């Protein structure tokens, strides 16, 4: 059984070049992480896989790349200026600051109850804190300030002067850049409902208590789709995207027992939402939200219509029906899902003779390296390099000629490389190489000319 503690995952991520602490030579900056050579490949592969299925292969959806900085009126319209808050509480004893909802949920979970605090009033939170004997996670005391709201948006200034007239925000989500461009995209691409607009981009939230490695950070990347449909068809499309998102994860190798779908109860739903479902992943630290699929009705388009004066009424070219489209929003965190795939892939396997190996069982489509070329001897490096150079034109391939072949296999297993290609002394004569499979460790001999197509076949999902 693999020891899937966060300490183990973080140690491997740092050691093997997946993720490094941000600004490490200056003592770091709390809650910032830099993706290393393998981490950036893994994350980019996941983003490419999302774009492939949600945009490239979709008959409905197109993409956009909206600016991070928006007219601040957009954030007033969306409700973020007035309502984008988390409940904050301070410990009077040690001065630590916490998200009230999270310490309540953690205290309840410690006593065997899984509760949802979202939707509770401050008074209800206080009562729940008493019920579960909530104490400060840092010092163990139960001496707290009153709960209050904390706005999560980062403020900055545009231009050379710092005044309220120049105040702007780093976007806390990518979605609003899609909504304000609804008419631009619909007209320019001649789209008819149902259709969607997808975007991948950075967002920023001044989280009260970030943590759990890359799970909750103040700077993060989102992969969001806003899917517009006719009112009355929204719940059907919500069900469709819920299953589509789940199957995307499964097709990329995520284990079904590592995830669960949780439909929000009525008292959890936003006032404008008809339905919301979270896809949660079982991280080593517990269940955490991975993907939110929300039926946002026509709330966002109506808000921007009201505040901008722009008419987002859609006119059906066949029926002449006029309506404000409803919107289904599957919103996925790129950093969270990258961490989830890393945790899910991690395994420790016992082998014969008290030997064991650490292996990352990534689907080949998202593995950082698709293959590694390993010359059996350094005397064969020139010929093996030619094979490596040819394969690199098609996909990322590693090259390793140091230490024994067994140790090189173990290194590639530990970074999730699905195939190792061994070039031996017979290869010069027969033009064949040995291909080793990461998961089964089985080997097969094949012509060098067939290796590229063989690997590409396994990249499909």
Curated annotation (Swiss-Prot):
ATP binds at residues 205-207, 215-220, 289-290, 333-336. GO terms for molecular function: ATP binding; catalytic activity, acting on a protein; glycine-tRNA ligase activity; protein dimerization activity; transferase activity. PROSITE patterns: AA_TRNA_LIGASE_II. It catalyses: tRNA(Gly) + glycine + ATP = glycyl-tRNA(Gly) + AMP + diphosphate. Its main location: cytoplasm. It is an enzyme of class 6 (ligase). Gene3D superfamilies: Anticodon-binding domain, Bira Bifunctional Protein, Domain 2. GO terms for cellular component: cytoplasm. It is found in: Cytoplasm. InterPro entries: aa-tRNA-synt_IIb (IPR002314), aa-tRNA-synth_II (IPR006195), aa-tRNA-synth_II/BPL/LPL (IPR045864), Anticodon-bd (IPR004154), Anticodon-bd_dom_sf (IPR036621), Gly-tRNA_synthase/POLG2 (IPR027031), Gly_tRNA_ligase_bac (IPR022961), GlyRS-like_core (IPR033731). Keywords: Aminoacyl-tRNA synthetase, ATP-binding, Cytoplasm, Ligase, Nucleotide-binding, Protein biosynthesis. Catalyzes the attachment of glycine to tRNA(Gly). Belongs to the class-II aminoacyl-tRNA synthetase family. This is Glycine--tRNA ligase. It comes from Lysinibacillus sphaericus (strain C3-41). The gene is glyQS.
């Amino acid at each position: 059984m693999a020891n899937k503690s966060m300490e183990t995952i973080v140690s491997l991520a740092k050691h093997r070049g997946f993720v490094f602490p941000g600004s490490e030579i200056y003592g770091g900056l709390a809650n910032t992480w830099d993706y290393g050579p393998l981490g950036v490949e893994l994350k980019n592969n996941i983003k490419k896989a999302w774009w492939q299925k949600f945009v490239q292969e979709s008959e409905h959806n197109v993409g956009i790349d909206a600016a991070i900085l928006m007219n601040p009126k957009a954030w007033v319209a969306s409700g973020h200026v007035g309502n984008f808050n988390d409940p904050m509480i301070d410990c009077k004893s040690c001065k630590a600051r916490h998200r009230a909802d999270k310490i309540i949920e953690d205290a309840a979970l410690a006593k065997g109850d899984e509760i949802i605090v979202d939707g509770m009033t401050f008074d209800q939170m206080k009562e729940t804190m008493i019920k579960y004997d909530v104490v400060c996670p840092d010092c163990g005391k139960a001496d707290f300030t009153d709960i209050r709201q904390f706005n999560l948006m980062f403020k900055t200034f545009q231009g050379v002067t710092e005044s309220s007239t120049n105040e702007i925000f780093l976007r806390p989500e990518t979605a609003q850049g899609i909504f304000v461009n609804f008419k631009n995209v619909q007209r320019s691409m001649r789209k008819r409902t149902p259709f969607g607009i997808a975007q991948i981009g950075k967002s920023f939230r001044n989280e009260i208590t970030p943590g759990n490695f890359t799970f909750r950070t103040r700077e993060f990347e989102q992969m969001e789709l806003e899917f517009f449909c006719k009112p009355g068809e929204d719940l059907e499309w919500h069900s469709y995207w819920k299953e589509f998102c789940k199957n995307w994860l499964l097709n990329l190798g995520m284990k079904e027992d590592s995830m669960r779908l949780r439909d929000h109860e009525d008292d959890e739903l936003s006032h404008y939402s008809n339905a919301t479902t979270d896809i949660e992943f079982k991280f080593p630290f517990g269940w955490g939200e991975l993907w939110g699929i929300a039926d946002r009705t026509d709330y966002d388009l109506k808000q921007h219509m009201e505040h901008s004066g722009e008419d987002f009424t859609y006119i059906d070219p066949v029926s002449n029906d006029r309506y404000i489209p409803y919107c289904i929003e599957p919103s996925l965190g790129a950093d969270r899902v990258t961490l989830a795939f890393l945790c899910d892939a991690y395994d420790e396997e016992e082998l014969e003779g008290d030997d064991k190996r650490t292996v990352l069982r990534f689907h080949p489509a998202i593995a950082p390296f698709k293959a590694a070329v390993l010359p059996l001897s350094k005397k064969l490096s020139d010929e093996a390099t030619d094979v490596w150079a040819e394969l690199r034109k098609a996909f990322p391939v590693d090259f390793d000629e140091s230490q024994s072949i067994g140790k090189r296999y173990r290194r590639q297993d530990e970074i999730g490389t699905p195939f190792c290609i061994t070039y031996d002394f017979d290869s010069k004569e027969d033009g064949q190489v040995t291909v080793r499979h990461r998961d089964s460790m089985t080997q097969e001999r094949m012509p060098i000319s067939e290796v590229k197509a063989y690997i590409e076949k396994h990249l499909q999902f």
